[in-house]
């Protein structure tokens, strides 16, 4: 049984049988039509959030993980694609997972997506890891869909409980001291990895500074040093900054998400950085594939690809025969 103390001080326990039932209900819809909703109770969601929040705070802000592990990028509420990722990679605990953030917003099923991820975090705290993305932030997900989904299916209270949980998510992970993972990218304020370890939690995401950059910055092919970012937040950084950073910290690779890429993954700076994006047909507007990066015991990286659904298939699925 996992026990958590809420901010009010009363004990809330999530019984392991309750947790298993939540996971069962959330995963059995993979056998149904894509898009079928799973409506948990408000009490169950609160238990997931408060229990996961405690685990996040017990674990470091810079996670230190070991391979083998599978790394996934943005999901953005595309729940049926999240279930496809687990079908490809193996449902926990058959594989270790690290997700790089942006679980909510834009897609139709942010609630199912984040609830399953939190449930797996609670069930397998030493094998399943979640980082914070720039959308795990009240000021962003208030606008891009998650708030509206919470309000439509529950109430604003539920959204606030998620906000408290998101404010405690770790922001980076180091795999075998060689692969540094975060949602966005590098920062001009990052001189030592201890600066990540020492970032405060719980916290909102500030408009500038190290935490902001880790979740918002982007690589820029034509940039030397640090450049302006078209997002209006943080910076872009050139291949020179990636090389400099890896050399200084004796690292092999930076792994990040945050940008849709056509093949689901894309290398940068002579394979010193990789972008992984795991939401195929992003928003129904892009023809991109989704990818998951598998890191084996020897730190060899390979990619499993979720192809974008063909338009024809989508049409046939929605047609009664």
Swiss-Prot record:
Disrupted gene: phenotype observed: Dwarf phenotype and decreased fertility.
Family annotation (PANTHER family): SERINE/THREONINE PROTEIN PHOSPHATASE, SERINE_THREONINE-PROTEIN PHOSPHATASE PP1 ISOZYME 4
Superkingdom, taxonomy of origin: Eukaryota
Bound cofactor: record note: Binds 2 manganese ions per subunit.
Phylogenetic classification of the source organism: Eukaryota, Viridiplantae, Streptophyta, Embryophyta, Tracheophyta
Function recorded in the entry: Serine/threonine-protein phosphatase that possesses phosphatase activity toward para-nitrophenyl phosphate (pNPP) in vitro. Acts as a positive regulator in the gibberellin (GA) signaling pathway to regulate plant growth and development. Promotes the GA-induced and proteasomal-dependent degradation of the DELLA proteins RGA and GAI by directly binding and dephosphorylating these proteins. Involved in the regulation of phytochrome B (phyB) signaling pathway that controls photomorphogenesis.
InterPro entries the UniProt entry points to: Calcineurin-like_PHP_ApaH, Metallo-depent_PP-like, PP1_catalytic_subunit, Ser/Thr-sp_prot-phosphatase, STPPase_N
A GO term, aspect molecular function: protein serine/threonine phosphatase activity
Annotated residues for binding of Mn(2+) 2: 102, 134, 183, 258
Positions bearing N-acetylalanine: 2
Protein name listed in UniProt: Serine/threonine-protein phosphatase PP1 isozyme 4
Broad class of the protein's primary localization: nucleus
The UniProt record lists the keyword Phosphoprotein: no
Cofactor: Mn(2+)
Places the protein is found: Nucleus; Cytoplasm
Positions that bind Mn(2+) 1: 74, 76, 102
Cross-referenced CDD domains: MPP_PP1_PPKL
Keywords: Acetylation, Cytoplasm, Growth regulation, Hydrolase, Manganese, Metal-binding, Nucleus, Protein phosphatase
């Amino acid at each position: 049984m996992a026990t958590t103390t809420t901010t009010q001080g009363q004990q809330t326990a999530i019984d392991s049988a309750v947790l298993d039932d939540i996971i069962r209900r959330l995963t059995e819809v993979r056998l149904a039509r894509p898009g079928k909703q799973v409506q948990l109770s408000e009490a169950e969601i609160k238990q997931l959030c408060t229990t996961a929040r405690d685990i996040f705070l017990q674990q470091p802000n810079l996670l230190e993980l070991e391979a083998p592990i599978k790394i996934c990028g943005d999901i953005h509420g595309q729940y049926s694609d999240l279930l496809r990722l687990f079908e490809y990679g193996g449902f926990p605990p058959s594989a270790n997972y690290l997700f790089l953030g942006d679980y909510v917003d834009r897609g139709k099923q942010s609630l199912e997506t984040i609830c399953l991820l939190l449930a797996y975090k609670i069930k397998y705290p030493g094998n399943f890891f979640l980082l914070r993305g720039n959308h795990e932030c009240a000021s962003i997900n208030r606008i891009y869909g998650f708030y509206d989904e919470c309000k439509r299916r529950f109430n604003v209270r539920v959204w606030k409980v998620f906000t408290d949980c998101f404010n405690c998510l770790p922001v980076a992970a180091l795999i075998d001291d060689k692969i540094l993972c975060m949602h966005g990218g590098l920062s001009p304020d990052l001189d030592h990895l201890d600066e990540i370890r020492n970032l405060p939690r719980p916290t909102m995401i500030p408009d500038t500074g190290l935490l902001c950059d880790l979740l918002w910055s982007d690589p820029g092919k034509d940039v030397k040093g640090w450049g302006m970012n078209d997002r209006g937040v943080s910076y872009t950084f050139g291949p020179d900054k990636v090389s400099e950073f890896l050399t200084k910290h004796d690292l092999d690779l930076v792994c990040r998400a945050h940008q849709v890429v056509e093949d689901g993954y894309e290398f940068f700076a002579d394979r010193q950085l990789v972008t992984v994006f795991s939401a195929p047909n992003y928003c129904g507007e892009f023809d991109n594939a989704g990818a998951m990066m598998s890191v084996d015991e020897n730190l060899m990286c390979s990619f499993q690809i979720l192809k974008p659904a063909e338009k024809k298939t989508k049409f046939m699925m929605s047609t009664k025969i």
